[in-house]
Amino acid sequence: MQFIEVKNAIKLLKNPKQNIAFLDIRERKQYVQGFAFGTINCPLSKFKTTIKDLVPDQSTAILFIGIKNTAQTIKVGRITKSLNYKNVFQIEGDYKKWKKEKLPIWAGEYTFSKAFGEWIEITSEVKNLFPKQLKKIHQKPNNYLQIDARPKKEFEKFTLPNSVQCSGGELPCFINNQTNLKKDYIVHCAGRTRSIVAYQTLKDFNFKNEKYVLNGGTQNWVLNGYDRDFKNKSKIKSTKLNFKSDLNLANQIAKKFNIPKSSQKNKNHSCHYFQLNSEIKNFKKIKGWKQVNATTLVQNTDKFIASTKTKIFIFSNIPTSAVFATIWLRRMGYNAIWQIKNPRSFKKSYSITKPDPTYFFPKRHLGNKSHSRGYLNWEHSLIPTIRKWGCKQPWVSANQNNLRDVKHTIYKVYKNF
């Protein structure tokens, strides 16, 4: 592993031709309190298994920060060498030098995806509904389908009165039937990002019905003095699948956004391969493909992907779900590709990706109003922070249909330094 001066690290980070992974090896609890923009957390305690998943291409230029002593330098160097990574650099002076040079630092959990969600709200012109308005809607007959866009496990811990559950990646399939097409829609999550993604997805897939986002989700509901529902049971498995109709819709939307497709059978171990889990129906798992919920892949992207240009193949037995994930990853600047045919299994193993403990405003989902308010204010601060760094267009507009060409935000931010 080579040392690299900060100024030369910035040259790498602003070069759009360079496939780069910027990794912070500190433990999660410390990392979320403040980290260099664009860094992905790869904690030293589970470094070897995590880096293989985050950076499958051994030729990727890897920048390390958060290394506190010689022993850690030696350990990181030894492991990366054993895994045959070829371009590995440690930033000289680490965070002390980074801060001295006034280079971009922010904080939080899944911050890149959260900021992206805020950008989508701005450029999509999302229609917001507020808790007091929703409470009034609940008090009289209405034609709204109120959808909690989080995965089943989260929904069953707590949700809002009158909500049904459908994770955002399966919304097109869930909506595209005679019953639900006659409804208008209110989407929510626990905060903001996944409901914004769900709202835009309804627009992306050409559902013309009236639609709203519950501003601030369950956290804002609690802040307004209303009670959540607990221990609900999702009925998502009762959704009837029409594969032909779903495939037709998927092809129509893939054409609309000009997203790349693949039917390749030979696997290159230097790429990402994701098979999207369905909560509607259990499908056979394909060996060599990492299993993930589509919405989680978009919401918690930095748990799965660190490289800026590595190819990402997306497969789902529900075609609209694969198109959903491909669209969103490409909007974020990743090189995602829709795998249109059932892929062959191959030999590739992955570590189990477990949810992290909540360290950032940790009591926000436990009814703590101070933490909820602080968290929502933090989300609102993300785009102003990026703009303060001189980056006015960190991602493409939500209204841009042509997603053939993509560029990662890391290049757009660091070109200003």
Each language-model region and where it sits:
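Rhodanese-like catalytic fold shared by cysteine-dependent sulfurtransferases
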Residues: 1-21, 25-145, 149-270, 276-417
